Amino acid sequence: MKPKTGNNANGLRLLTRGAVYVAVVAVFLVGQAFTQSPTPGSDYELKRINLPGATGAVALDYFAYDRATEKVWVPASNTGSVDVIDEKTDAVSQITGFPTGEIERHGKKITLGPTAASIGNGVVYIGNRGNATLCAVDAKTFTRGECVPASPDRDVTPDGVIYIAATREVWITTRPTLGGDPAAAKSLQVFDASDPQRLKWKSKIPLEGLAEGYAVDNQRGLFYTNIEGPGKTLAIDVRSHKIVAEWNPGSADLQGLALDIARRFLFVACGDHVVSIDAGHDGKVLDSIRTGAGLDNIDYSADAKLLYAAASQAATLTIAEVGNDGKFHLKDTVPTVKGARGVVTGKGETAYLIDPAEGRILKLIRK
């Protein structure tokens, strides 16, 4: 996503090509969490889960929920760690030892490290902006395996990381490194993940602009992403790596994506609203719902047929039901905190939001 702690100048040329990082993984539990007062009239409440080692703001971006283990993986960038939250107990395990790098942006120094997570086949893939690498971590033991460069050249660093189960590949959206060629980041980097623990760079897919957000339909072999600048949403065939459709969601401020695979509704975050697109019929815009300003990643629960969209500036979480016609029906608007953005769904109607300013996760619970 568009990092709120630095965008295009967010990587360092620190990695020797082909290097493999071997590190001791330190894991400990943090059980401190408290529930804020429920909002009158709302069916939901928020529980605050503090991240270990966070004494202030933490650069948080892409995080992920592993349905097989019922754990939430949170790359806590500037702490040099990845934090794993147990959904049942809210205990937090910390995987340490990820390299960080210091960059300068707008005259200020910023420390970045791991910033993106994606659930793979028994592993979790971690993108690290601090040293422009992609690492595999065992989903059960939390043991960190091999780390590889995010690209054959040194001009790009990972943004979003996506495991494509249909082809056993990992795709990453990218941003330029500090001093790197901005044009190099206008592509998707593709890795062979047939051996889940040992990624191998495979190819890149050229794009018209920077990719922003993603959603994957493994059933039909389609990958969706937004393109900054032109304001387009693309559908890409995961086997041929060819762009098969381009749609206009009606906004130039495109953020995250979510997908109802069964009904083929694609949801596009557009700054202060979300649109519903008919991905099965030429990308027709079916509906739109206002959320307030400051959207980033959104998510969708296929089981509950609910869309979740956190607006950082409005400090609200919009929860909307999606009908069989692709139209939204507002279910609840839950007050959050300023800066809370990005959401992933857990079991049932549980969801998680990132709160970078306070270095914590907000857990949404139905009363």
Language model feature labels by segment:
Residues 19-32:
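Bacterial N-terminal signal peptides
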Residues 1-16:
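N-terminal secretory signal peptides that target proteins for export/translocation
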Residues 34-367:
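Predominantly soluble domains enriched in secretory-pathway, periplasmic, or organellar proteins
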